């Protein structure tokens, strides 16, 4: 459930460093960006990549928006009845729900309402866009990074990203390197206040975690879901959960002190 928590800080340094250019727009209620790093970036390839990602994000939003009464998820009956290309998102959400004991809970709204995949949908959309870009060969001639509201995936190449200070004071608390398929997502308070709820109680989370970033070797979907789970569980239980169920992922924690400061 990334909330603009991670931003691109810099590309990996080197002699004759390639130029970075981006295509940017609004999607799924946040900022979407496709960044390119190459010696002679082809403008038409960039536009094509932006169009492909835009189409992927629009499809996910059209199917998974709980705010649209006509969307597929608003009329959910069973996972077997959903569109085949959306089914992996449901299945992953339900799997994480089971493993986390409900800390991640697509049915947190209760009262017989259907699932809400907001805690995983943006990561899923990034993975869908990445697959479509790879299918047409975008990324072979240069490095490509997808960013959907802080859900990042390095489609190709090596990228450096910075975890923004969740206190709102600005600055970067730690840098990360993503390469060739790696993805990351962050959950924290940031601009939107207490938006993260414990799926077991429906109550906004209140603990000593300021933010947690999860890096996964291949899945933005998994990183998105796990960042929410770990924020809810807290550091001790979160680290244990990660080791038991997702040992190929790792977390970067930013904690509050006894006075509530980051």
Descriptions of predicted regions:
Residues 3-262:
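Mature catalytic core of soluble alpha/beta enzymes
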